[in-house]
């Protein structure tokens, strides 16, 4: 892997001054920053390659199509899908989950059941609530304990022949816990259920192998993987994607259209109606190239060192409350905490005055906050460009906030 200084040099935003302080960006769980290698791919596309893709006979259209489909292959190889046609470009993880939920909402009936976990992001709860409302199916919830660890014993009891879909996150966006999705998938398949995994928080830190996991659907967002916003991908097993009805109608997703009926395009285009985010897809491919240039194993190892260092430092602060699994081998580089007697929003405001960007609130995971009976947490989430020195400054900032607000 490059040196930390070389990596940081790839990210121009890290040279920003915020409130007269050098930017310390610890909000990577919300979105990661973008390296010049990805920015340059975006500039190159709009400068020299901009055209609508597919069906165009002119050179520019064919070049743009080739770049877009090459990016799809990069996503396929990164996640080890069998075919590039099993990779759908979407607007992001939320869009991907809604696509699957809409499809199964049309296939399910009263008496069927969907299982999610108590740890989910709202994007993996609300689409299934809507699907259940439309179909008459029921929503069941895997409980968690005080560490945010899912109760697999109760999960097994929830599973039955009525279970049609299990939809769970790979990594908690609020706590950083890595869930045992291998076991969750295997148990669901025993009863004939399909499994969707929300991989938004896992993909930047781990390298999920969809074939090894035997997962049915896996959803990710590019903007959490050093790529642009507004684009992501959904992996789906070919045989399951063929069973699902189209999510949206329009151009590109059809074979033939007449007023009596229409027939639909082959995968993946059946689910890609309209002009896609062409530049976003190409830039997503560039972001994957960037991550591989650093090494996925190396990224994970370095971020884990940051996590361990930060947790050890935080534990020295009197009055701090830490959330999440205490076994840091089962965590990504996400830390949720509170200071006793201090609202998380106030802590975040003080840190911002010091140039430190963190996320405060419920992190689109209100059921977790309800479990802990708190309004929210302060969340610091690290990426490969963060440093131990930044963590030291962060710790001093927390101490300053505590002195000012307690």
Locations of the language-model features?
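Pyridoxal 5′-phosphate
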Residues: 1-406
């Amino acid at each position: 892997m490059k040196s930390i200084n070389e990596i940081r040099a790839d990210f121009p935003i890290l040279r920003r001054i915020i409130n007269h302080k050098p930017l310390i960006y610890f909000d990577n769980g919300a979105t990661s920053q973008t390296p010049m290698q990805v920015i340059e791919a975006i500039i190159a596309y709009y400068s020299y390659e901009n055209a609508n893709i597919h069906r165009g006979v002119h050179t520019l259209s064919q070049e743009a199509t080739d770049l877009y489909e090459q990016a799809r292959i990069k996503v396929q190889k990164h996640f080890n899908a069998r075919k590039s046609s099993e990779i759908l470009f979407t607007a992001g993880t939320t869009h991907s989950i809604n696509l699957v939920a809409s499809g199964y909402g049309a296939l399910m009936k009263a008496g069927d059941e969907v299982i999610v976990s108590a740890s989910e992001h709202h994007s993996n709860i609300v689409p299934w609530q809507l699907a259940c409302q439309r179909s008459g199916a029921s929503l069941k919830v895997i409980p968690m304990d005080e560490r945010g660890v899912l109760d697999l014993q109760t999960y097994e009891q929830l599973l039955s022949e009525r279970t049609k879909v299990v939809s769970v996150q790979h990594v908690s966006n609020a706590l950083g816990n890595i869930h045992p999705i291998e076991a969750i998938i295997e148990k669901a398949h025993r009863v004939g259920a399909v499994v969707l995994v929300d991989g938004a928080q896992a993909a930047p830190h781990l390298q999920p192998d969809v074939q090894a996991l035997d997962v049915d659907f896996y959803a990710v967002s590019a903007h959490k993987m050093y790529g642009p916003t507004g684009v992501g991908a959904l992996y789906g097993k070919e045989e399951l994607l063929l069973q699902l009805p189209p999510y949206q109608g329009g151009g590109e997703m059809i074979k033939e259209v007449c007023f009596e009926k229409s027939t639909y395009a082959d995968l993946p285009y059946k689910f890609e109606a309209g002009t896609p985010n062409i530049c976003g897809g190409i830039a997503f491919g560039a972001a994957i190239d960037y991550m591989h240039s650093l090494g996925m194993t190396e990224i994970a190892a370095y971020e884990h060192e940051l996590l361990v260092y930060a947790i050890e430092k935080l534990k020295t602060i009197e009055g701090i409350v830490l959330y999440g699994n205490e076994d840091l081998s089962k965590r990504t580089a996400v830390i949720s905490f509170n200071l006793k007697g201090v609202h998380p929003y106030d802590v975040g405001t003080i840190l911002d005055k010091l140039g430190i960007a963190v996320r405060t609130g419920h992190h689109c995971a209100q059921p977790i906050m309800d479990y802990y009976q708190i309004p929210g947490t302060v969340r610091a989430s690290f990426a490969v460009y963060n440093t131990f020195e930044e963590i030291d400054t962060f710790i001093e900032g927390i101490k300053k906030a505590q002195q000012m607000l307690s």
